Amino acid sequence: MAKKDYYEILGLDKGASDQDIKKAFRKLALKYHPDRNPNDKKAEEKFKEINEAYQVLTDPQKKAQYDQFGTTDFNGGGFQGGFGGFDFSDLGGFGDIFDSFFGGGFSSGRRKNGPERGSDLEYTLSLTFEEAVFGVEKEISVTRNERCETCNGTGAKKGSHPHTCDKCNGTGQVRHQRSTPLGNFVTMTTCDKCGGRGTIIKNPCEECRGKGIVRKHRKIKVKVPAGVDTGNIIPIRGQGEHGKNGGPSGDLYINLRVSPHSKFKRKGFDIYLDAHISFGKAALGTSLKVPSIDGDVKYEIPPGTQPGTVFRLKGKGVPKVDGRGRGDQYVNVIVDIPKNLNEKQKEALMMFMEASGEIQPRDVEKKSFIDKIFKNDSK
């Protein structure tokens, strides 16, 4: 199935503001609403489509997922394709526009006895550097709405059952016909007797007090793949709030936060590390044990290595989330210059400088001058 372009459906460019999204929806919803286009299947489908686009682009969590991945798979069960469950109340004066044409009821006319999807939940999960790099399984605790097991979600006391509302005949809505300058229109408003549920509970369940849902604490296992980083989100389908009236459950979104490491610094899938060596080893070369996320790695430092030289350890970085290889590790060489020299060290350096032609063969005055330099450096 081809992915839907929700911005294109609303006639907008990607990145449109919330205000532009609402304006576009108002215009299209008024044009394609089924009450203005009776028995027009194309108009009905178009209205469902723009309704779906609006639900995604005005939900921060869903919009962020859509903008990043271009997918419509947010809740595992798809969107409510119809328009009866849409709430126009957040459109400001738009509900009044519909009221003037269709006789009101659009802000409160949703059928409460129909299936309702549960709300999404968010959880922030803290990880150590190693857990993020190699992956881990964590158990978290969440509190959510769940179907009451005592009444099986009906809200009625055990041994009794909800009664069908005699005013709306169980539909949760009352039909009204009204004449307007545009013609006769039929609208549906929420039944004021049952509150839109379609049923009346005479003996409410004591456990849930007639709501059909209760708050529960649940332990949920979260599988964190190798290579994740701060800001990544792991969606767990169906682990959010339970739906009402047989509706699907919402989703649980795990926001990851990774603690920094004392030695390693991470950029993407690459790791950076500073390695300290003496100036003698930098000049002569040495075999160096370099810490890595897999353990120490032996690396040969060539003679004449300069401060700030960066060596690459290929494939020693962070595993990529998609499983396609690993990043690299970069080692920045820092040459430590001693601050305090003893007499033997000074003599050795003097001999080196003489041998390299940096200074003339020593005399007492020059030696005294050099000694003063080292003495000043040692302070």
UniProtKB/Swiss-Prot annotation:
Gene Ontology CC entries for this record: cytoplasm
Coiled-coil intervals: none
Positions contributing to Zn(2+) 2 binding: 165, 168, 191, 194
Record bears the keyword Metal-binding: yes
GO MF: ATP binding; heat shock protein binding; unfolded protein binding; zinc ion binding
Keyword field: Chaperone, Cytoplasm, DNA replication, Metal-binding, Repeat, Stress response, Zinc, Zinc-finger
Cofactor(s) listed: Zn(2+)
Zinc fingers (CR-type) by residue: 135-217
Localization: Cytoplasm
Record remark on domains: The J domain is necessary and sufficient to stimulate DnaK ATPase activity. Zinc center 1 plays an important role in the autonomous, DnaK-independent chaperone activity of DnaJ. Zinc center 2 is essential for interaction with DnaK and for DnaJ activity.
Cross-referenced SMART domains: DnaJ
Naturally occurring in which organism (per UniProt): Clostridium kluyveri (strain ATCC 8527 / DSM 555 / NBRC 12016 / NCIMB 10680 / K1)
CXXCXGXG motif repeat residues: 148-155, 165-172, 191-198, 205-212
Homology family: Belongs to the DnaJ family.
Protein name: Chaperone protein DnaJ
